[in-house]
Amino acid sequence: MNALVAHNSKAWDKKVETGNEWTVAVEQQVIEQAKKGNWDIRVTPMKDVPKDWFPPIKGLKVLCLASGGGQQGPVLAAAGADVTVLDNSEKQLNQDRMIAERDGLTIHTVKGSMDDLSVFNDESFDVIVHPVANVFVENVLPVWKEAYRVLKRNGILISGFVNPVVFLFDTELEQQGVLKVKHSIPYADPEDLPKHKVKKLIENNEALEFGHSLEDQIKGQIDAGFIVTGFYEDKGGFVLDQYIHTYSATRSVKV
């Protein structure tokens, strides 16, 4: 495990402890409804993934990629999928384990990094669900290549990601409602922030983030062998949201 992966693992353990929105597991009634066939999941903050992005879910082998936290995996398992959740945070995985025990679900959990799926054989899954997470890896291209490898032919990859435009601005001024361009894209916390700020992030167990270009996010999937068949945009908690959607989601098919 490299230093970045190890650090962000601890950072996400901390996010679980502090109740970050992406770490709060779904309520029991959500699981009860999913067992009846009434379910939705999100890979971006506000919008549900369109139902027609999924094939009939029962019996499908689904990998929830960098998707711990008890939000996507348990819902899909309750709906009838054979679910594996891979995440870099043990405490995020514990959220899925807790829901599985509480609600009588079978969920396989694997601790690992989204850019190294060597624990899985080629063509192991029918669907990969990858919510906003690749902002925490330095290079997103291996994520797409590994996803392609472990998907079956005609398998589906559903991904959410941050629009890199959010990384252009001075974060301290943005917190005051002021948008001032300061950085370029691609962006990386360890290289683009002053050393003392990076040191503080590390000391405080705050996750290090990376703003990948749209070319790497979308063309990266195409270059890996996918055909992009669906797209939508969403909003989050940025000041910039009043001017442009700051999140995107794609549906891609392995051919």
Swiss-Prot record:
Gene3D superfamilies: Vaccinia Virus protein VP39 (3.40.50.150). Keywords: Methyltransferase, Transferase. InterPro entries: Methyltransf_11 (IPR013216), SAM-dependent_MTases_sf (IPR029063). One of its GO terms (biological process) is methylation. GO terms for molecular function: methyltransferase activity; S-adenosylmethionine-dependent methyltransferase activity. Pfam families: Methyltransf_11. It comes from the Bacteria. Belongs to the methyltransferase superfamily. This is Uncharacterized methyltransferase YbaJ.
